[in-house]
Amino acid sequence: MSVPAELGYTKEHEWVAINEGIATVGITAFAAEALGDIVYVEPPEVGSTVTAGESCGEIESHKSVSELYSPVDGEVVDVNQAAVDDPELIGSDPYGRGWLFKVELAEEPADLLTPEQYTQLTEGEG
């Protein structure tokens, strides 16, 4: 399974891309595959404050409803309305068009997993 090298990861299966103080967040291909057909996503609202490791929304598939966790601290500055309107994007392109929300970082995240660490985690769960 694809684990892009330029991203950070969490144990809850979110990915983070940081560019000039803005973190783009999504769920990993591993999580998308485990969920199956994603039918609904409720990301945090623009302007809300999110805290690393805390629930900030939910994602629903035919199989289950799962909490969406923020991997970073900060203020939500954008939500991917295309993924809200068409949740299948999350499963079909989780690292591209299926991103979920963007956060203006309060501080650099300290405990993200490297791609290698995340691969080891998923091999243990897979």
UniProtKB/Swiss-Prot annotation:
Disulfide bridge positions per record: none
Function noted in UniProt: The glycine cleavage system catalyzes the degradation of glycine. The H protein shuttles the methylamine group of glycine from the P protein to the T protein.
Domain Lipoyl-binding: 22-104
Residues the record lists as N6-lipoyllysine modifications: 63
Cofactor note: Binds 1 lipoyl cofactor covalently.
Classification via NCBIfam families: gcvH, PRK01202.1
Cofactor names: (R)-lipoate
Superkingdom of origin: Bacteria
The entry's keywords: Lipoyl
GO cellular component term of the entry, any: cytosol
PANTHER family, per the entry: GLYCINE CLEAVAGE SYSTEM H PROTEIN, GLYCINE CLEAVAGE SYSTEM H PROTEIN-RELATED
GO terms for biological process, alphabetical: glycine decarboxylation via glycine cleavage system
Keyword Ligase among UniProt keywords: no
Name of this protein: Glycine cleavage system H protein
HAMAP family: GcvH (MF_00272)
Record's subunit section: The glycine cleavage system is composed of four proteins: P, T, L and H.
Name of the gene: gcvH
PROSITE patterns named among the record's database cross-references: BIOTINYL_LIPOYL (PS50968), LIPOYL (PS00189)
Family: Belongs to the GcvH family.
Species for this entry: Thermobifida fusca (strain YX)
